[in-house]
Amino acid sequence: MFERRIFMANPIVTIKMKDGGTIKAELYPEIAPNTVKNFIDLINRGFYDGLIFHRVIPGFMIQGGCPEGTGMGGPGYGIKGEFTSNGFKNELKHSKGVLSMARAMHPDSAGSQFFLMVANAPHLDGQYASFGKVIEGIEVADKIVATKTDRQDRPYEDQVIEKMTVDTQGETYGEPEIIEE
């Protein structure tokens, strides 16, 4: 008698940029389940549509997901930081193409802001909730990070996310567990 295992396919996010570029990323619910639920929930609510990558640093990452476009905004709540130094096993390394949640100093302060690695950054491993990886369109992120920026790393020309969608491959992801602000 042999055991039959059914593996569910991971969700795939499509980030369509206003300039026509597209980035696709696979999310890893087995690594950071609540982070993935939160990201999917925000995408399905249209939260990211029209927002910008407000912080881009060559050789490091691009950051988006702030409704104010300043790096100070969020969805009005936080989620528990699913990373090792916060008592949660997460071994996904911050290598090129990895998606991770931005946060303030408090480990449970992530909300909607995320960053996409354009280079390896091992010093972030275990400190931030990595939860997915680009599977297509990394060259779009490379183009975004190469844009001219001001002293606060904000692009002079807005890098606009026209629409973000997610294909959950038929799986249902419930509401995320949130921490009210």
Segments (PLM) and residue ranges:
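Cyclophilin-like peptidyl-prolyl cis-trans isomerases
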Residues: 2-181
